[in-house]
Amino acid sequence: MFFKLLKDAFKIKQVRSKILFTIFIILVFRIGTTITVPGINAKALSNLNDLPFLNMLSLVSGNAMRNFSVFALGVSPYITASIVVQLLQMDLLPKFVEWGKQGEVGRRKLNQATRYIALVLAFVQAIGITAGFDTLSRANLVANPNVQTYALICVLLATGSMIVTWLGEQITDKGYGNGVSMIIFAGIVSAIPDMIKGIYEDYFVNIPSERLTSSFIFVGILIVAVLLIIYFTTFVQQAEYKIPIQYTKVAKGAPSSSYLPLKVNPAGVIPVIFASSITAAPAAIFQVVSALGYDADWVKTAQSLLATTTISGMFMYAFLIVLFTFFYTFVQINPEKTAENLQKSGAYIPGVRPGKGTEDYMSKLLRRLATVGSLFLGFISILPILAKDVFGLTDAVALGGTSLLIIISTGIEGMKQLEGYLLKRKYVGFMDTSE
């Protein structure tokens, strides 16, 4: 199915150009992740590999954090800025509420505001991460620690983050898929060979012969579990709830009824990315505070709540996913606008009053779908973390549920976009021929 779709797509010049453009942008990003920031002692980075929050930071940075590259911040500042801007549109700041109702013009203003906020956050995160990692690496990370060096590193990191954000926007505008998701997707995929190598070394290298059988059984169970997660995730991400729609005025030959499809998980994978981004930065801050000698009870409690390696941290992570799923579901689908659009087009839901009645019906339905979606996302995300505690898996494997969610959801989104374009092209081609 996938390869046939790709084969059909490559036959069309415009589609082929979009796919190749997306691949090119991802390659540019991957090249940037290999360039360590000047002034950084690369050898000191090895002291940071065992930090519990590093895998989460690497996840949201597209795997650019491990070698402290110029793209180390990734799209994390932009993600946080997006959350802030979306919250400000919820009757918190009149100007942002007004922009949210201005259509395309308002969207451009909101995007510009998001970029400015992201730039400020990028500088703040750059300062925090550089100073924090220098402390955690026993003051060896910054090769020549002085104001000028710190300023240069922070400027490079903030600039790198804005470049990554721009690369993501180029994918969204001129390529296929959501740019932010594609950047993170590329980083996760690039880390898969190292993850497989790590599993192989842990279970098959220098292992006594009497333990090889149990290693094969365990890895076999792991593969089956991954395949089941892939199947379950694909099923839920593609599942739809169809709302029946009828029309008051029907043109001759046109159907009198149709349906409005809503995804069972309308928020997609964005809540997982939001939760990962929000969890990672504070976890790093409290790790630094602890390293500086502030071992107060509240610091330990905060560390426990934010570290996905602990039970409390795991459930905090799941809670954030649930919270952002409800939030982003209503960002994606506005019940008031949906009811208004249906009424304008002369459509209605059988048994539901147009206008306010339809809005209330949609709100109630979206809350139910968000409940299903949030439980699904939370379950898939924390399942491997639970398995880590039971089977002693590595932190990288423990984040496999989150990684699989992003990979599968991004892949499905790209395929749907590709299918939609090919279908539209066939339809337009048919209409042109008939004329």
UniProtKB/Swiss-Prot annotation:
This protein's UniProt keywords: Cell membrane, Membrane, Protein transport, Translocation, Transmembrane, Transmembrane helix, Transport
GO cellular component: plasma membrane
SS bond list: none
One Pfam family linked to the record: SecY
TM annotation in the entry: 19-39, 68-88, 116-136, 147-167, 179-199, 216-236, 269-289, 311-331, 372-392, 395-415
Membrane topology: Multi-pass membrane protein
Single GO biological process annotation from the record: intracellular protein transmembrane transport
Compartment annotation: Cell membrane
Superkingdom of origin organism: Bacteria
Entries under InterPro entries matching the protein: SecY, SecY/SEC61-alpha, SecY_CS, SecY_dom_sf
The family this protein is said to belong to: Belongs to the SecY/SEC61-alpha family.
Job description of the protein: The central subunit of the protein translocation channel SecYEG. Consists of two halves formed by TMs 1-5 and 6-10. These two domains form a lateral gate at the front which open onto the bilayer between TMs 2 and 7, and are clamped together by SecE at the back. The channel is closed by both a pore ring composed of hydrophobic SecY resides and a short helix (helix 2A) on the extracellular side of the membrane which forms a plug. The plug probably moves laterally to allow the channel to open. The ring and the pore may move independently.
Subunit structure: Component of the Sec protein translocase complex. Heterotrimer consisting of SecY, SecE and SecG subunits. The heterotrimers can form oligomers, although 1 heterotrimer is thought to be able to translocate proteins. Interacts with the ribosome. Interacts with SecDF, and other proteins may be involved. Interacts with SecA.
Protein name: Protein translocase subunit SecY
Upper lineage: Bacteria, Bacillati, Bacillota, Bacilli, Lactobacillales
Gene that this sequence comes from: secY
